Amino acid sequence: MHSTDLHLEPNEASDLARVFDDDTRARFGWDRAFVTVLDEAAAEDCLALLVHGAGEPLDHGWEAVRVHADPGGDGGRTEDAEACAVHDGHVYILGSQFGEKAGPLTARRSWIARVREEDLAGAPGGQRVPMELSRLRFGLHRAVNDALTRAAVQLLPLGPRSRAAYVDATIAHGAAENKRWAGRVGSADQPINVEAAEFRADGRLLLGLRYPVTADGHPLLVEVHDLEQLFADPDAAPRCGNVWVLGDAGDADAPAGLRGLDTRGGDRFDAIVGDLDAAGKSATVLDDHPQGGNAHSQHIRFELPLTAGGGQVTSERVHDFGELRRVEGVAVDAGGHAHYVIDEEGHVGLRTLVLE
């Protein structure tokens, strides 16, 4: 496995997606280009390009380029970017929809944004790129919880500490401050932590949840419909549909959530699965479920059937990262090399695995 350390400020990187066609990369002298998101910045400052000089060996020739955007009047109102995906000429970015490790949930993390890939190609010149930003105000939280209820998925029970910190405290805050989103978080809800996203062949957005997981510790994916409406109408409510379970990833002793998603076409996906939260960092989820910190990071592959309306699917394991725990994104290039972004102290790690 080839290894490269890149320095960005801030240095908390999540997810990875391929960007630009062959002609665009050639114009800049690159043979590979990816976008990642930095979770300690607002949406307009969360993007970075990771690019590789044409002809350089895989463990050399990488450069990180910060990208700054203009979200109009919503600057500075968002945080915690965790997922990115490319579709139909746009790069989509999602907030986690979650909260601090000690709670409560925060509306600043409930958003989706996009920039045009064509505009992103001009970012190395230093100009801010236009950004469409939709502040969801727990609308996606509501839609995902409703979809999980309709699918009758048995979830890992929400423990008493997590319920108090993430659900009860959020409801109380919304009521006390008369927030616009008051009522969208219900007492029977699960907090959701979105850390992966990708698109199905028909254009539906596929969310990968780090939390919650099933009662047996398996990761969950939820489809989002009518994505365009969220950008056309600031008051539009997200709608979610099919729910999928990766039935052979994770288990009751080492539950696993999704950390990254990638597709090279069709409904075949590469994914990173791993622990529900980082151990040793006072995460409330792990106070209730200590086993949630046990799962290794793994690269897996799976395929979603075209006609089924959700349900359980199988996967195959590509790579187990062992003690390397903070693997947060995967993208497979045209040559079959799997690239991973690693959230490491003080720098952003990029690893490349040459697949057989």
Residue ranges and their predicted role:
Residues 1-356:
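Sequence/structural signature of beta-propeller domains
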